[in-house]
Protein backbone atom coordinates (compact mmCIF):
# COMPACT_ATOMS: atom_id res chain seq x y z
CA UNK A 1 0.00 0.00 0.00
CA UNK A 2 1.34 3.37 -0.96
CA UNK A 3 0.45 6.45 1.10
CA UNK A 4 1.02 9.87 -0.35
CA UNK A 5 1.17 13.03 1.74
CA UNK A 6 0.16 16.23 0.15
CA UNK A 7 1.83 19.59 0.46
CA UNK A 8 -0.36 20.62 3.41
CA UNK A 9 0.66 17.53 5.39
CA UNK A 10 4.34 18.36 4.84
CA UNK A 11 3.79 21.95 6.02
CA UNK A 12 2.00 20.69 9.14
CA UNK A 13 4.80 18.21 9.87
CA UNK A 14 7.40 20.97 9.50
CA UNK A 15 5.44 23.29 11.79
CA UNK A 16 5.17 20.57 14.44
CA UNK A 17 8.90 19.83 14.20
CA UNK A 18 9.82 23.50 14.64
CA UNK A 19 7.44 23.85 17.58
CA UNK A 20 8.98 20.79 19.25
CA UNK A 21 12.51 22.28 19.27
CA UNK A 22 13.19 23.73 22.68
CA UNK A 23 13.65 27.46 22.66
CA UNK A 24 15.72 29.63 24.91
CA UNK A 25 14.66 29.08 28.49
CA UNK A 26 13.61 31.98 30.65
CA UNK A 27 16.42 33.37 32.74
CA UNK A 28 16.76 31.70 36.11
CA UNK A 29 16.24 33.45 39.41
CA UNK A 30 16.22 32.08 42.93
CA UNK A 31 16.24 33.50 46.45
CA UNK A 32 16.71 31.29 49.49
CA UNK A 33 14.35 31.97 52.36
CA UNK A 34 16.89 33.13 54.93
CA UNK A 35 16.00 35.16 58.02
CA UNK A 36 18.92 37.58 58.14
CA UNK A 37 19.83 38.41 61.70
CA UNK A 38 20.92 41.83 62.93
CA UNK A 39 24.21 41.62 64.76
CA UNK A 40 23.84 41.90 68.53
CA UNK A 41 27.31 43.36 69.15
CA UNK A 42 29.28 45.91 67.13
CA UNK A 43 31.88 43.36 65.94
CA UNK A 44 29.56 40.40 65.51
CA UNK A 45 28.74 40.71 61.80
CA UNK A 46 30.53 37.38 61.37
CA UNK A 47 28.47 35.74 64.16
CA UNK A 48 25.15 37.14 62.89
CA UNK A 49 25.94 36.04 59.32
CA UNK A 50 27.15 32.61 60.40
CA UNK A 51 24.21 32.10 62.74
CA UNK A 52 21.86 33.13 59.91
CA UNK A 53 23.31 30.35 57.75
CA UNK A 54 23.19 27.85 60.63
CA UNK A 55 19.53 28.71 61.33
CA UNK A 56 18.73 28.30 57.63
CA UNK A 57 20.24 24.80 57.94
CA UNK A 58 18.02 23.97 60.90
CA UNK A 59 20.34 24.73 63.82
CA UNK A 60 19.11 26.69 66.84
CA UNK A 61 21.92 28.69 68.46
CA UNK A 62 22.11 32.27 69.65
CA UNK A 63 24.76 34.61 68.27
CA UNK A 64 26.47 34.44 71.66
CA UNK A 65 26.56 30.63 71.45
CA UNK A 66 27.79 30.80 67.85
CA UNK A 67 30.60 33.10 69.00
CA UNK A 68 31.52 30.72 71.83
CA UNK A 69 31.60 27.75 69.47
CA UNK A 70 33.88 29.68 67.11
CA UNK A 71 36.34 30.50 69.87
CA UNK A 72 36.19 27.18 71.76
CA UNK A 73 34.55 28.68 74.82
CA UNK A 74 31.86 27.35 77.14
CA UNK A 75 28.62 27.43 75.13
CA UNK A 76 26.61 29.71 77.42
CA UNK A 77 29.36 31.96 78.76
CA UNK A 78 29.41 35.62 77.72
CA UNK A 79 31.36 35.77 74.46
CA UNK A 80 33.53 38.88 73.94
CA UNK A 81 32.73 41.44 71.25
CA UNK A 82 35.61 40.22 69.09
CA UNK A 83 36.25 40.42 65.38
CA UNK A 84 36.72 37.15 63.52
CA UNK A 85 37.40 35.59 60.14
CA UNK A 86 35.41 33.19 58.00
CA UNK A 87 37.68 30.45 59.38
CA UNK A 88 36.11 31.13 62.79
CA UNK A 89 32.66 30.68 61.24
CA UNK A 90 33.89 27.36 59.88
CA UNK A 91 34.94 26.29 63.38
CA UNK A 92 31.44 27.02 64.70
CA UNK A 93 29.83 25.17 61.77
CA UNK A 94 32.01 22.11 62.43
CA UNK A 95 31.01 22.07 66.11
CA UNK A 96 27.33 22.26 65.09
CA UNK A 97 27.71 19.30 62.73
CA UNK A 98 27.48 21.44 59.58
CA UNK A 99 30.06 20.84 56.85
CA UNK A 100 32.16 24.03 57.13
CA UNK A 101 32.48 24.66 53.43
CA UNK A 102 35.39 25.79 51.35
CA UNK A 103 37.37 28.91 52.33
CA UNK A 104 38.09 31.02 49.24
CA UNK A 105 40.65 33.82 49.39
CA UNK A 106 38.75 36.09 47.01
CA UNK A 107 35.27 36.50 45.55
CA UNK A 108 33.27 33.77 43.86
CA UNK A 109 32.48 33.93 40.16
CA UNK A 110 28.83 34.52 39.31
CA UNK A 111 28.38 30.92 38.13
CA UNK A 112 29.68 29.69 41.52
CA UNK A 113 27.15 31.87 43.35
CA UNK A 114 24.33 30.42 41.22
CA UNK A 115 25.65 26.88 41.78
CA UNK A 116 25.52 27.37 45.54
CA UNK A 117 22.08 28.99 45.60
CA UNK A 118 20.68 26.33 43.23
CA UNK A 119 21.99 23.70 45.67
CA UNK A 120 20.19 25.43 48.55
CA UNK A 121 23.39 26.73 50.16
CA UNK A 122 23.86 30.40 51.13
CA UNK A 123 27.32 31.87 50.56
CA UNK A 124 29.21 33.80 53.22
CA UNK A 125 31.14 36.83 51.98
CA UNK A 126 33.69 39.05 53.64
CA UNK A 127 33.85 42.55 52.21
CA UNK A 128 36.42 45.27 52.73
CA UNK A 129 35.19 48.85 53.14
CA UNK A 130 37.20 51.28 51.00
CA UNK A 131 37.27 53.53 54.07
CA UNK A 132 38.83 50.70 56.11
CA UNK A 133 37.61 47.71 58.06
CA UNK A 134 35.80 44.56 57.03
CA UNK A 135 32.28 43.15 57.24
CA UNK A 136 30.58 39.76 56.79
CA UNK A 137 27.39 39.23 54.80
CA UNK A 138 25.31 36.38 53.37
CA UNK A 139 24.58 35.95 49.65
CA UNK A 140 21.22 34.21 49.31
CA UNK A 141 19.96 34.73 45.76
CA UNK A 142 20.52 35.66 42.16
CA UNK A 143 18.64 36.73 39.03
CA UNK A 144 20.16 35.79 35.67
CA UNK A 145 17.99 38.26 33.75
CA UNK A 146 20.15 41.11 35.04
CA UNK A 147 23.11 39.33 36.71
CA UNK A 148 21.82 40.43 40.11
CA UNK A 149 22.82 39.01 43.47
CA UNK A 150 20.89 39.27 46.72
CA UNK A 151 22.63 39.57 50.06
CA UNK A 152 21.81 39.97 53.71
CA UNK A 153 23.54 42.63 55.79
CA UNK A 154 23.60 42.16 59.59
CA UNK A 155 24.46 45.77 60.46
CA UNK A 156 21.54 46.90 62.68
CA UNK A 157 20.84 50.26 61.03
CA UNK A 158 21.25 49.00 57.44
CA UNK A 159 18.70 47.37 55.18
CA UNK A 160 18.66 43.68 56.07
CA UNK A 161 17.97 42.47 52.49
CA UNK A 162 19.79 44.01 49.54
CA UNK A 163 20.41 43.46 45.84
CA UNK A 164 22.70 44.78 43.14
CA UNK A 165 24.46 43.67 40.01
CA UNK A 166 27.07 40.98 40.63
CA UNK A 167 29.77 43.33 39.31
CA UNK A 168 28.77 45.99 41.83
CA UNK A 169 28.97 43.48 44.68
CA UNK A 170 32.44 42.32 43.61
CA UNK A 171 33.74 45.87 43.85
CA UNK A 172 32.49 49.45 43.94
CA UNK A 173 33.34 52.83 45.49
CA UNK A 174 32.21 51.69 48.97
CA UNK A 175 33.47 48.10 49.31
CA UNK A 176 34.96 45.10 47.56
CA UNK A 177 34.50 41.36 48.12
CA UNK A 178 37.66 39.77 49.56
CA UNK A 179 36.88 36.27 50.94
CA UNK A 180 34.17 33.63 50.65
CA UNK A 181 32.77 30.42 52.06
CA UNK A 182 31.03 28.16 49.57
CA UNK A 183 29.84 24.54 49.87
CA UNK A 184 28.59 25.21 53.42
CA UNK A 185 26.60 22.16 54.48
CA UNK A 186 27.56 20.14 51.39
Residue positions per predicted region:
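Generic detector of low-complexity/intrinsically disordered segments
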Residues: 16-18, 32, 183
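A broad structural signal for alpha-helix termini and local helix breaks/kinks
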Residues: 22, 57-58, 96-97
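Conserved active-site-adjacent core of cysteine acyl-enzyme catalytic domains
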Residues: 54, 65-186
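Active-site nucleophile-adjacent alpha helix/oxyanion-hole segment immediately C-terminal to the catalytic cysteine
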Residues: 28-74
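Secretory targeting and sorting signals
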Residues: 1-27
Amino acid sequence: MHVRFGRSAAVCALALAVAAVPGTADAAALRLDISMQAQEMSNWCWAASGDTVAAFMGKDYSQNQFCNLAFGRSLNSSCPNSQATLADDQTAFRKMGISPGNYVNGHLYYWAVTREIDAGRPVMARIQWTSGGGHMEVLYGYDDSSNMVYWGNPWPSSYRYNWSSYDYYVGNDSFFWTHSLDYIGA
